[in-house]
UniProtKB/Swiss-Prot annotation:
One of its GO terms (cellular component) is intracellular membrane-bounded organelle. It comes from Kluyveromyces lactis (strain ATCC 8585 / CBS 2359 / DSM 70799 / NBRC 1267 / NRRL Y-1140 / WM37). GO terms for molecular function: cyclosporin A binding; peptidyl-prolyl cis-trans isomerase activity. Its EC number is 5.2.1.8. Belongs to the cyclophilin-type PPIase family. PPIase D subfamily. PPIases accelerate the folding of proteins. It catalyzes the cis-trans isomerization of proline imidic peptide bonds in oligopeptides. It catalyses: [protein]-peptidylproline (omega=180) = [protein]-peptidylproline (omega=0). It is an enzyme of class 5 (isomerase). GO terms for biological process: protein folding. The keyword Isomerase applies. Keywords: Cytoplasm, Isomerase, Repeat, Rotamase, TPR repeat. This is Peptidyl-prolyl cis-trans isomerase D. It is found in: Cytoplasm.
Length: 372
């Protein structure tokens, strides 16, 4: 069926710079009227808006005015550019055609509205499954090329009104030939300078099977290993990026009814990543991230005693280097209960106690001057 479905495109710029092309396939066999509206607005030859007669019925030149991470990217207000305008080719509004198709995956194209039967030109691209929109918004297409660009738009910083900080503009749009096919390598993940060819979102990566725990773990481990290699080469900034990416990949994985052995593997990998993030952050003097990552490791499920000691040691050092000797002593003393003979922990505890003692002496001296 996809061979006969029409395909349209947006050429996108972000912050005034060309960002790439998004290609849509329209479900004209399921919702022909809704698909035709979108196609004609991409084509741009259907006349002018009734509310603003000098503005063509076209997406060209309009913007993505509302973007909410892990939800959707909204566009299509070519009259007001803020979500209050836009028109369909049938008039200001047209009815909901049907709700046959569900919001069951990312990269679907669906109509935005202000209630029942108020479809115009505004649409959104889903970033995740959004089942709460079923029966309320009409799904009429999907992104078949440019998914990575959609993720870039999704991850763009936004203001309080969810408007992208860097303008996301539809520089051009149109209808593709009926025989257009997506190039075989169009959605392939490019390999970066460090050998990483995995997507930020595991569900977007054709190399990863979300239904296979080993496929997911292998992907996370592969990115983690790149981080470790960069850490050994003292490229701490890159190492942190890769460890953070690995951690985020794992956070996206929500398996059901896994064997206990697999659950333990996932938990162990999660803790290992938190510890690595804490360590590389410590090395690069990013102490706030050390504190948060070590705390995440301590609060994670199934953290063993050795890992708890590492987390407390690294968090204790972060407190020490940020002049919080009291908290450093607290963490390092607790670390010794898990690893009582670890010389690095013992040495750090001695330093922290000395710093705490010096701080108390300094405070006493300051107080004595106040009352002398």
């Amino acid at each position: 069926m996809s061979e006969t479905r029409p395909k349209t495109f947006f050429d996108i710029s972000i912050g005034g710079k060309p960002a790439g092309r998004i290609v849509f396939e329209l479900y004209s066999d399921v919702v022909p009227k809704t698909a035709e509206n979108f196609l004609k607005l991409c084509e741009g030859n259907s006349g002018f808006a009734k509310s603003k007669p000098d503005i063509p019925l076209s997406y060209k030149g309009s913007i993505f005015h509302r973007v909410i991470k892990s939800f959707m990217c909204q566009f299509g207000d070519f009259t007001n550019f803020n979500g209050t305008g836009g028109e369909s080719i049938y008039g200001e509004k047209f009815e909901d055609e049907n709700f046959t198709l569900k919001h069951d995956k990312p990269f679907l194209l669906s109509m935005a509205n202000a209630g029942a039967n108020t479809n115009g030109s505004q649409c959104f691209i889903t970033c995740v499954p959004t089942p709460h929109l079923d029966g309320k918004h009409v799904v009429f297409g999907e992104v078949i090329q440019g998914k990575r660009l959609v993720r870039t738009i999704e991850n763009n910083a936004t203001d309080e009104a969810d408007k992208p900080a860097k303008e996301v503009k539809i520089e051009d749009c149109g209808v593709l030939p009926s025989d257009y096919t997506v190039p075989a390598d169009a959605e392939a993940t490019p390999t970066d300078a460090y050998g990483d060819n995995y997507e930020e979102n595991i569900t977007d990566d054709s190399k990863v099977d979300p239904n296979d725990v080993n496929s997911v773990l292998n992907a996370v481990e592969a990115v983690k290993e790149i981080g470790t290699k960069q850490f050994k080469e003292k490229n701490f900034e890159v190492a942190l990026v890769k460890y953070e990416k690995s951690s985020q990949m794992l956070k996206q994985y929500f398996p059901q009814d896994l064997p206990e052995e697999d659950v333990k593997k996932i938990d162990a990998l999660r803790v290992s990543l938190f510890l690595n993030i804490a360590l590389v952050s410590l090395k690069s003097k990013n102490y706030s991230r050390t504190l948060s990552a070590a705390t995440e490791a301590l609060h994670a499920d199934n953290t063993d005693d050795k890992s708890k000691a590492k987390a407390l040691y690294r968090r204790g050092l972060a407190y020490y280097y940020t002049k919080n000797a009291e908290m450093a002593v607290t963490d390092l003393e607790l670390a010794t209960t898990y690893q009582p003979h670890d010389t690095a922990i013992i040495k750090a505890l001695q330093d922290a106690k000395k710093a705490k003692k010096e701080l108390i002496a300094k405070q006493k001296k300051s107080l004595s001057k106040m009352f002398s």
